[in-house]
Amino acid sequence: MALSTFKREHIKKNLRNDEYDLVIIGGGITGAGIALDASERGMKVALVEMQDFAQGTSSRSTKLVHGGLRYLKQFQIGVVAETGKERAIVYENGPHVTTPEWMLLPMHKGGTFGKFSTSIGLGMYDRLAGVKKSERKKMLSKKETLAKEPLVKKEGLKGGGYYVEYRTDDARLTIEVMKRAAEKGAEIINYTKSEHFTYDKNQQVNGVNVIDKLTNENYTIKAKKVVNAAGPWVDDVRSGDYARNNKKLRLTKGVHVVIDQSKFPLGQAVYFDTEKDGRMIFAIPREGKAYVGTTDTFYDNIKSSPLTTQEDRDYLIDAINYMFPSVNVTDEDIESTWAGIRPLIYEEGKDPSEISRKDEIWEGKSGLLTIAGGKLTGYRHMAQDIVDLVSKRLKKDYGLTFSPCNTKGLAISGGDVGGSKNFDAFVEQKVDVAKGFGIDEDVARRLASKYGSNVDELFNIAQTSQYHDSKLPLEIYVELVYSIQQEMVYKPNDFLVRRSGKMYFNIKDVLDYKDSIIDIMADMLDYSPAQIEAYTEEVEQAIKEAQHGNNQPAVKE
């Protein structure tokens, strides 16, 4: 129970009293990766997140750990090579949260990719990204392309490319990395905001003053080194330090829409051109839905809850109807949406899609380290780079020596399944185990596929007498209780949006079971009447934002 909600007070006591080799500000995938790398090397690590884990960018992506085909188009050869190799590592270390998915790349007359350039491009991609033989590209005829996805626009169709991307659950990837870091000894807590830095007599950062946003308690965490990994908020965090450099972020926004497959019966993931601006976007089937995205526009509005506008929705609806003309989807067919912010490093005069997704480390005179930019796929390598630097500074300043990076072959929480090749057999073995508990085969398969080697703990929860007193289906009940016991869920939206993904991909379950979920959480976490009222309102607001993102108030932070 290293990341249990019930351990919050114990964790806070340690954070108050101990001194850490490294304190990390930010609980998205970048911060989680740094916490795991540093704690695996033997550093004493603390991490604070002002919201819930992955509540910012790391739960709002296109949910792909991809090799960066789009970067080949921009001749960023090094990025393609690195992301391709990292993608394979991410998959191997956590096959329960990352799944290979064949992607169709339709080629139309006048489109981004012609037949020759697609063949050359995908061939280069295979070599640069180190794609395994079974997943290397295939070139398809027009007939073969339509056999893969009959909904694709026939007019001007010349054929298609077929290559493998990796689909992930970004928020669950983040929490599984975080849980493994906690198992390695990192002290990790959410809803804890950094307020300001503390300094020693040489004006070097030696700690962070924080506030617990659930209790309003204020305390200081002592640290030898501090890393700012706050994603879209890195400039806000740096503004409290006297020694910041002149570099800054440029935020861009990406919006996705979710449509039920009864309205958009997509059977195959597709990467395709839009008509309006030549951007390429994804349409991906998932859990009886199809999700489509993303947009790419500059953004300077509220960061904690980015706005989905009617213009964003119209752009994606038009894109769907352009590439899949027979479906004729309308705005009313959108079940839910999400918007995420990309924290990119500012480059003057560049359009949103032209700004590099590279990451950079900035070191201030105060000793504060900031990691900015980057992308989901590269989280492990980004962590390695910055922890290498932290290790170097700790040796120079304190004479401390730590082992080198060891995350390349380190399974994340739930990933102890015998490797990706064994994952399907592992799942079927767990389905057999579940039969002995009387758990439905389909439920058991979904749970084993989602939670990997942690699934036995969910099966055990299914045997408790409390379940029989609840009004929830077994699957939702065990996921909810597990997320409180093992994944530091405190508010209903932590579960509904990020641990389960239901707010995006099964909003009907949210509408049907939200009251029962709040009742169980209130009982387990001893909510006050005021908390019940506040958290119920937060759920209603999240539903409203998912269904009608354009109704959010246009206020600035």
Swiss-Prot record:
Cytoplasm among the record's keywords?
yes
Query: Which SUPFAM superfamilies is this protein grouped with?
Result: FAD-linked reductases, C-terminal domain (SSF54373), FAD/NAD(P)-binding domain (SSF51905)
UniProt-recorded Gene Ontology molecular function terms: glycerol-3-phosphate dehydrogenase (quinone) activity
Q: Which InterPro entries match?
A: DAO_C, DAO_C_sf, FAD-dep_OxRdtase, FAD/NAD-bd_sf, G3P_DH_FAD-dep
UniProt keyword annotations, A-Z: Cytoplasm, FAD, Flavoprotein, Glycerol metabolism, Oxidoreductase
- For the ligand (FAD), the binding residues are 21-49
Q: What class of enzyme is it?
A: oxidoreductase
Q: Choose one Gene Ontology CC annotation of this protein and give it.
A: cytoplasm
Q: In which pathway does it act?
A: Polyol metabolism; glycerol degradation via glycerol kinase pathway; glycerone phosphate from sn-glycerol 3-phosphate (aerobic route): step 1/1
| Gene3D superfamilies to which the protein is assigned, alphabetical | Alpha-glycerophosphate oxidase, cap domain, D-Amino Acid Oxidase, subunit A, domain 2, FAD/NAD(P)-binding domain
**The EC number(s) this enzyme carries:** 1.1.5.3
Compartment annotation: Cytoplasm
Instruction: Kindly list the cofactors needed.
Output: FAD
Q: Ribonucleoprotein: is it a keyword of this entry? A: no
UniProt record similarity statement? Belongs to the FAD-dependent glycerol-3-phosphate dehydrogenase family.
PANTHER family in UniProt:
ANAEROBIC GLYCEROL-3-PHOSPHATE DEHYDROGENASE SUBUNIT A, GLYCEROL-3-PHOSPHATE DEHYDROGENASE
Instruction: State what protein this is by name.
Output: Aerobic glycerol-3-phosphate dehydrogenase
